[in-house]
Amino acid sequence: MFSIKPGPRNLPIDNPTLLSWNITDGDLNSKLNTLEYLNCITNIINSCGVYPQGLKDREIISTFHAEKVINDLLKNDYKISLSPDTTYRELNKAAQRSITAPDRIGERKTWVYQRDTMIERGDNSGVYQYGRAEHFTHIISDKPSPKDKYVAYAINIPDYELAADVYNINVTSPSGQQETFKILINLEHLRQTLERKSLTAVQKSQCEIITPKKPGEAILHAFNATYQQIRENMSEFARCHYGYIQIPPVTTFRADGPETPEEEKGYWFHAYQPEDLCTIHNPMGDLQDFIALVKDAKKFGIDIIPDYTFNFMGIGGSGKNDLDYPSADIRAKISKDIEGGIPGYWQGQVLIPFIKDPVTKERKQIHPEDIHLTAKDFEASKDNISKDEWENLHALKEKRLNGMPKTTPKSDQVIMLQNQYVREMRKYGVRGLRYDAAKHSKHEQIERSITPPLKNYNERLHNTNLFNPKYHKKAVMNYMEYLVTCQLDEQQMSSLLYERDDLSAIDFSLLMKTIKAFSFGGDLQTLASKPGSTISSIPSERRILININHDFPNNGNLFNDFLFNHQQDEQLAMAYIAALPFSRPLVYWDGQVLKSTTEIKNYDGSTRVGGEAWLNKGCSTYQQLYNEFHALYIDKAGIWSAFEGVSATKNVLAFSRGDSVNINHSPHDGLVIINKGNEEVEGTWPNKLQPGIYKNMGSNSVNIIINNTRKIIPPGKVFTLRGGTLNINIPGRSALLLGKTGEPPNYLYL
């Protein structure tokens, strides 16, 4: 067990009325004041994490004590400032938990098991040595495990600790001395607790919260990546201006079944063949890994968007002959693990601990080895959708897809599980979803499964008083993948968007239009924003824009028409969609955990698309700059295109961006020029730019003539403009995204 160490006594102790804390640990019996107690907590977290092995240590750093500490400091006129500790990474999986991970011993507590080495040694020394278990607060000595070599512990950690995380707490004494510690807290529960305390308005004002700003609004599709892979790169994703990360389905699935053909084992598509929504265990990670991912992302202001696979269940390899889920071999493995080796593990992977019984309406506990779906929860048809039925609504929404059985909205069990799944995700801090294969869902199923919709959530401003009632309203990023291949699809998707104003959608129609415009002989002017016309039927603020989707390269030649003809075209298309107002680009990254196609070749063996562009985590230099431009201009409505001259040809698309763009001849503060041709283009942009500090957020260096002087501006270069018209040289196969980042100093010009 970790030993409590009071630490140095040179802490900013000004007020003798600070609380005293009695700490007993073995031979150590110390009486510490609040600040010394904070030092002890900091030592434990730095040495062992927030779930150390010792029972006393875990109790000491609980959120309950943290709230008492902060209340005591504020009552004694100390100032405190709280900020997320972005350097802290909880590596012990016991740090994460289901709210009420169930076992057979009762509700509202989690029971975990630790191996009793005294029993293993066969002696009666009374010396217990336990390995790391789940998480716990105290021993229940009269509750033995039903397994011979384990001892049971009760976990009675409050639900609100689920969202607790490590924060830096900077303490300033009344005399001005400062010291920084670490503490485990849940901000919202802290505010509620302190509201009930007898603090004055002045004392409340001394508690400041510093929350991370959202790095951007672009979405990274972390396809085929483990939760740990994503965690390890979180700071880089923030640097590249991602505000959202879409992750693989968070369910129980496996990369092969007992009778899965060898040629199908280990492939990516198994992630879209769920075995269970109630538990989380798959090649990408388990429930603890997922919770750690959500917490780490929030430290950087990033939201996690899971892929929701509600339409179909897995086929369990070619040998699955029933509709019991999870499959029999999975249930058998879980039971064997529980009885024979790691009984606490599977209970800790339960995402949905309880649901209401569809018949009795009584609260029903979920056990990981039980059957959760049966034949009555699926559509009756056992036929697959045939090639000539893709415009048949009945077939699309009731038949199987490649053998996968279709869930039915007529089943109360299905709807309750899906609805509770959404609720549990929200409890973990998930602020959005991607609804997979929406064209196969009846509107009723979408309506019932993700209801009630969460349209907005309250987010604290970057630097605010803990008790400030004003919050920043943030929209939740809910969107659906509705693959549009015909007019019927377009109509059905539009109907869904009309019914659900909380949903956005991937704009497949604009993708096809963009592919055609960037192809050889295609006309970029078809993508220009012109008065009285729109480039898409989906409202701009509800569009998710893509240049590649995981389905396109991974289904043989089925989606070849959805692929660009050249890597450079795919990259230039990303510059275009990142520059549009209100919409969000979805950037593709293949983490290569399961087998997948990472490159499409031409007939001559050269790369058509993919390769490094799909494997670089969405963090190439050009993508970082595109995302930065997008974050700068997403909320600025103005867009104006040039309709004549060298800036308006089949190969060149140019448009201004900024708030004042609707007045065509007023100075603008953003400029986009895309040249898909091989030849460089030089010309004068007809609209003046505002004076200011500008940055080249495009893919290539450009030549700009200012005051009769030609300057080479490389990507990422910041420079100052007096304003006025620009003469610009744009290289072939390149994109210029010029954005104003600040006001110019009067004394410095390029």
Curated annotation (Swiss-Prot):
Q: Which GO-annotated molecular functions does the record name?
A: alpha-amylase activity; cation binding
Annotated Pfam families:
Alpha-amylase_C
Q: Which domain of life is it from?
A: Bacteria
Q: Which GO BP annotation is one of this protein's?
A: carbohydrate metabolic process
Q: Which SUPFAM superfamilies match?
A: (Trans)glycosidases, Glycosyl hydrolase domain
Instruction: Please give the name of this protein.
Output: Putative uncharacterized protein YgaQ
The organism is Escherichia coli (strain K12)
